Swiss-Prot record:
Expressed in the intestine. This is ATP-dependent Clp protease proteolytic subunit 1, mitochondrial. It comes from Caenorhabditis elegans. Its main location: mitochondrion. It comes from the Eukaryota. SUPFAM superfamilies: ClpP/crotonase. It holds the Pfam family CLP_protease. InterPro entries: ClpP (IPR001907), ClpP/crotonase-like_dom_sf (IPR029045), ClpP/TepA (IPR023562), ClpP_His_AS (IPR033135), ClpP_Ser_AS (IPR018215).
Length: 221
C-alpha cells in the first residue's frame, strides 16, 4: 500500500520534473545493474542512496512529494540515515511544518545540509535534522525571521487571521528554541526582523553542528 502511494507521488514528482526540465534540464543517468542498464532521472537515482533534495520554495506540492519520499525511505529502513540537501528560500509555513513533523515522526535519522541558502522555513527544516548531523557548506547563507501574511474581509476576519499568525509565530519560536538551545527571548528578538547568517554564524547560533570544508583552498570567511 505504502509503496503504491509513494510510486504515485514519485510519478507526480516526475511530472513536475518534466515541467521544469525545459528550463533547467534535469539530467538522466544510466545505472549498470546485474540485470542490465536502467535509466533514472537524477533525483530518483539519488533516492536509492537515501538522498532527498529540497531545491525550491516550500509549497504543498513540494511538501507532498518530499514527505512521500521520507515515508518510503522509512519503510525501507528505520535505522539508516536519510540525507536531505536544502537550497530553498522558504515558503508556506503549514507545508514546511508538514515536512518538519514527518522528519520528527520517522525513526530514521535525517541529516540536513544547506547548499546555497536555507531561508525562512528552509532554515527551520535545516535545524530540524538529527543533532550532530546538521551541516552547512562554507558559502551557504541562512536566514531566519518571523512568519508574515495578509488578511482581508471584515474586521473580525482580520483579527482572526492576525491571531492565527501570532500562534504560528509562537510555535515557530518554540521549535527554534528546541533545536538551537537558545532562550525563547533570544529567538524572539532575533526573528523579529530578517536575520541573515553566514555558515559560521549559523553554527554559533545552533542551527547547524558543523561546516563542511572544501577539499581545495578557499578564502576565509
Amino acid at each position: 500500500m505504502l509503496r503504491r502511494l509513494v510510486t504515485s507521488s514519485l510519478s507526480a514528482s516526475r511530472s513536475m520534473s518534466a515541467s521544469v526540465q525545459s528550463r533547467v534540464g534535469i539530467p538522466f543517468v544510466i545505472d549498470n545493474e546485474g540485470k542490465g542498464e536502467r535509466t533514472y532521472d537524477i533525483y530518483s537515482r539519488l533516492l536509492r542512496d537515501r538522498i532527498v533534495c529540497l531545491m525550491t520554495p516550500v509549497d504543498d506540492f513540494i511538501a507532498s512529494a518530499l514527505i512521500a519520499q521520507l515515508l518510503f525511505l522509512q519503510s525501507e529502513s528505520g535505522k539508516k540515515p536519510i540525507h536531505m540537501y536544502i537550497n530553498s528560500p522558504g515558503g508556506s509555513v503549514t507545508a514546511g511544518l508538514a515536512i518538519y513533523d514527518t522528519i520528527q515522526m520517522i525513526s530514521a535519522p535525517v541529516s540536513t545540509w544547506v547548499i546555497g541558502q536555507a531561508s525562512s522555513m528552509g532554515s527551520l527544516l535545516l535545524c530540524a535534522g538529527e543533532k550532530g548531523m546538521r551541516s552547512a557548506l562554507p558559502n551557504s547563507r541562512i536566514m531566519v525571521h518571523q512568519p508574515s501574511g495578509g488578511a482581508q474581509g471584515t474586521c473580525s476576519d482580520i483579527v482572526i487571521r492576525a491571531e492565527e499568525i501570532t500562534r504560528l509565530k509562537r510555535r515557530l519560536n518554540e521549535i527554534y528554541v528546541h533545536h538551537t538551545g537558545m532562550s525563547y527571548d533570544e529567538i524572539e528578538k532575533t526573528l523579529d526582523r530578517d536575520r541573515f547568517m553566514s555558515a559560521h554564524e549559523a553554527l554559533k547560533f545552533g542551527l547547524v553542528d558543523q561546516i563542511e570544508t572544501h577539499n581545495g583552498s578557499m578564502p576565509s570567511d
